[in-house]
């Protein structure tokens, strides 16, 4: 009698193509798959991998963050590359001249960049300009800034937990009575 081998762990799980059926995204994947294979540059492999990622791993980055990263010494003539969205930030008044390549740039962010004399290019333009990723800076937004992440971690109420409780409603009877005031049981 043979042994029934468990094949549960045989498969290596990773994306080899994007889940999205967006034809423009798939054209970019075709282009960067070719570049990653033919140039051997690590930059192209990273871009290709990020194009496969789901939306939660391609978080948006604000224009103010891009400005802050691009103000570092020696980055004046480099192109900021973001596999995701660049959003506007109304808190900044002066935008320096920037060269940005992103999957998507919001209308107001684009207007601000162009007004400052900068440029917004697409990934196919970047491939022509810099096929190996030279003179570029790869940036990405904060992955843990999502609202859902606030609920992760040790359960709310456990000592040293900073997890946000999942509350049905924000009324006075929800998470605001017992343990929060003397009149209802006790005050913590």
Swiss-Prot record:
Basic residues composition bias: residue spans: 178-188
Listed GO biological process terms: translation
Major subcellular location class: cytoplasm
Region (Disordered) residue spans: 169-188
Single GO molecular function: structural constituent of ribosome
GO CC list: cytosolic large ribosomal subunit
Record bears the keyword rRNA processing: no
Domain of life: Eukaryota
Gene3D superfamilies: 3.100.10.10
Compartments, record wording: Cytoplasm
Entry keyword annotation includes Translocase: no
UniProt KW keywords: Cytoplasm, Ribonucleoprotein, Ribosomal protein
Entry similarity comment: Belongs to the eukaryotic ribosomal protein eL18 family.
Record protein name field: Large ribosomal subunit protein eL18
Protein's organism: Timarcha balearica
